[in-house]
Amino acid sequence: KLDSSRRTLLERINAMGIDAREDEVFSSAYATAAYLKDVLRFPTDRKAYVVGMNGLEDELDANGIQHIGGTDEQDCQGLDGLDFSPLASKDALDPSVAAVVCGIDTKFSYRKLAKAFRYITRPGAEGEVRAGEQNGGCHFVCTNEDVTFPSSEGLFPGAGAVWKGIQVSSGRDPIVVGKPHQPMIDTIFVRFAFDKSRTLMVGDRLDTDIAFGQRGGIDTLLVLTGISTLEHVHASDAAAVPTYVVNGLCDLNTALS
């Protein structure tokens, strides 16, 4: 949910007593970096402007994609009142940037919003991204569309809440890589040749997790410990209907034993 790197997620999984390898872990941050590199063929001499955190930056690094913004201290700071001069100066934007990549960002600032806006609305931004050029085309790619995520302290805004401000102000729709969208499905299916009939997608959201499994042609299991409830499942306008529903993962363990 927090666009963690595969390494960070692997540490959490291993700490739960589950034996797994890094190449078996797929996060929206990893899928986004892989999509930029392998599908969009992002030029190695261009940069991504990041609205996001360490996990997203780590995966961009692992895929050889240069980036700025993100955890940079200056970009995490707001402006001084209505003084827009720091964003309007000649050197405010890097002409080598050819993608705005957005995920969850707990240090999201007006400076980041404005820079992302200016990159994807500059002249020619919706055109082709080319190597060896300055300015021109600029992709708008987001990790996932979760507008909220559950934590031990309650419900908080997610990545979708961050990038929608950029979308609304710029008028540009992003490429959303994570669940339930096709880029994530393609990344997993290309990496592993597995039997869909023996696969189960487990998640806590109808609109992302369960819809993702259905689009991928696999059975789904909704866990009622997160966002979606039985009321959501039975609603006439349900985003998706799961194959199975359990109160918690302990119920799944009982069923499999």
Regions found by a protein language model. Name each.
Residues 2-23, 33-257:
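Asp-based, Mg2+/Mn2+-dependent phosphohydrolase catalytic module
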